[in-house]
Regions:
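Alpha-helical transmembrane segments and membrane-interface helix-loop junctions
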Residues: 1-145
Length: 145
């Protein structure tokens, strides 16, 4: 982005450099819940891909309940005070022309919250599938390569 602005408008600023990592933080942290929703997160499908639908549901439930939810809640718990500290102190970048830091830090607890909410949604969908009140599509995953 900085190179684009510099060459197009003959203008450069440290804020253009810093906005890049703000945008990266937003893309990663706010996009994580969407990645979970469409089941494109990283995992090893060597065994999972050969299991029955019911076994996949149980593995997903275990992973969501034992790992994803506790981790996201704990990370949000850790990130929230960091955000508040930056917000109340008005922490700024040490670079000349730099930006305030709290908007980028807000992406952490917001992203963890969104992944937690999506994790709860995934748990509800899997429990509904086990109760035969919701139909899940197990064919959207990419085949093993």
């Amino acid at each position: 982005m900085n190179a684009f602005i510099r060459y197009l408008f003959d203008y450069s600023s440290n804020s253009w450099l810093e906005i890049q990592w703000y945008l990266f933080a937003a893309a990663v942290m706010l996009g994580a819940a969407q990645v979970l929703r469409v089941n494109e997160h990283v995992r090893v499908d060597i065994i999972y891909g050969k299991l029955s639908s019911k076994a996949r549901i149980y593995i997903d439930l275990l992973g969501l309940l034992l790992f994803l939810l506790p981790a996201m809640i704990y990370f949000a718990y850790l990130a929230w005070p960091l955000f508040l500290g930056m917000y109340y102190s008005g922490e700024m970048s040490s670079n000349a022309g730099g930006l305030i830091r709290w908007p980028a830090m807000l992406m952490l607890p917001a992203g963890f919250f969104l992944v937690t909410m999506q994790g709860l949604s995934e748990i509800i969908k899997r429990l509904a599938w086990l109760a035969h009140v919701y139909e899940m599509d197990f064919h959207y995953e990419r085949p093993l390569q």
